[in-house]
Regions:
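N-terminal signal peptide c-region/cleavage motif recognized by signal peptidases
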Residues: 19-21
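Conserved beta-strand scaffold positions in the cores of enzyme catalytic domains, especially
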Residues: 55, 68, 132, 210, ...
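Short beta-strand-to-loop junctions in surface cap/lid or active-site-entrance loops
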Residues: 68-92
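Bacterial N-terminal signal peptides that target proteins for export
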Residues: 2-10
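Short glycine- and acidic-rich boundary segments immediately preceding or forming the N-terminal edge
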Residues: 24-69
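Active-site/substrate-binding loop(s) of hydrolase catalytic cores
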Residues: 83, 92-93, 97, 106-239
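Active-site-adjacent mobile loop/cap segments within catalytic or ligand-binding domains
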Residues: 219-223, 231-232, 244-297
Length: 297
């Protein structure tokens, strides 16, 4: 199988398209995986336990672990790698942070991340360093019925510390949404442990691109530098605008990190297997072409 890197590296590629090995099970991952498997038909508890999920330092409002998976890039002999134009390959692989389940009632935003984790062992994906938070709002997902907000009734995607938060977040909520409780931004930015956890992961990991999964608008949204993606699979670019306290505003506008928001077409029913694959392949193609690490480390 051919290996594709920026400008199609014309050197021997040592990355194998193999499944990643099963990792040690953290004790907290056992109950976490069981709970997800009971809620989502697409998640198998036994497979989930083998992913090597680790709890973060913070917990959700209701005390549930906030789980993360770290998948470093496969090692390569950097001295042998050059692009077709003769340029050396950046020595630090691009870092990609995937975030699912910010809104607990968008079930497919969690399910598709688990599907994509099955493909991280393939050659193309192994060129990159991945950090994956498949479920950022466990209290919302595991509520009966599932809800958009977290355990405090806060919309986590309006709770990030954007520079305009104090001036605009609460007025926007009151005037533009009619104080819709599903879109309450909180009393202050980062009031919620889930938001603080994601913020800390971004600061620690220093991603070159953030991919946030939502539903059900069936589009792509984009904030930040780099050439915007035009299409992933059947999802076409349709920029939704910038909201006070949103992840796209915080990451893409304030932190200057490319933020892709993938809006799946249905919050409860997964895209077809073919469409899941097309979104993934087009995302990797865009990353390969447009995302280069800002610094070497």
């Amino acid at each position: 199988m051919s290996c594709r890197l920026p400008e199609r590296i014309a050197a021997t590629c040592l990355l194998a398209s193999l499944a990643l090995p099963a990792l040690a099970q953290h004790p907290e991952a056992l109950n976490w995986c069981d709970a997800l498997a009971q809620r989502l038909r697409s998640v198998e508890a036994e497979s989930c336990r083998k992913l090597g999920m680790e709890p973060g330092k913070l917990r959700s409002v209701q005390g549930r672990p906030l789980m993360i998976r770290d998948v470093p890039a496969a090692p390569v002999k950097l001295s042998a790698l050059k692009t077709e134009s003769g340029k050396p390959v950046p020595q630090r692989p691009a870092r990609i942070f995937i975030i699912g389940g910010i809104h607990g009632d968008e079930l497919t935003s969690v399910s598709i991340v688990f599907r994509w984790m099955d493909w991280l062992g393939e050659a193309e994906a192994r060129h990159y360093h991945w950090r994956i938070a498949p479920l950022s709002n466990p209290d919302g997902l595991l509520a009966r019925p599932s809800r958009r907000t977290n355990g405090n009734g806060v919309d986590l995607n309006r709770n990030f510390p954007t520079p305009d938060w104090f001036a605009k977040a609460l007025p926007y909520w009151a005037q533009r949404t009619g104080k819709d409780p599903r879109r309450f931004p909180g009393e202050k930015p980062m009031s919620e442990p889930e938001t603080r956890w994601l913020h800390e992961e971004i600061e620690r990991f220093k991603p070159d691109v953030i991919v946030s999964i939502h539903a059900p608008y069936g589009i792509l949204d984009y904030d930040g530098p780099a050439q915007e993606p035009r299409r992933f699979g059947r999802l076409n670019l349709n920029r939704l605008g910038v909201y006070p306290g949103s992840l796209g505003n915080f990451g893409g506008v304030h932190k200057n990190i490319p933020v892709i928001t993938i809006e799946l077409p249905n919050a409860a029913a997964m895209p077809s297997p073919r469409d899941q694959r097309l979104i993934w392949d087009d995302m990797l193609a865009w990353i390969r072409k447009h995302i280069v690490p800002h610094t070497l480390s």
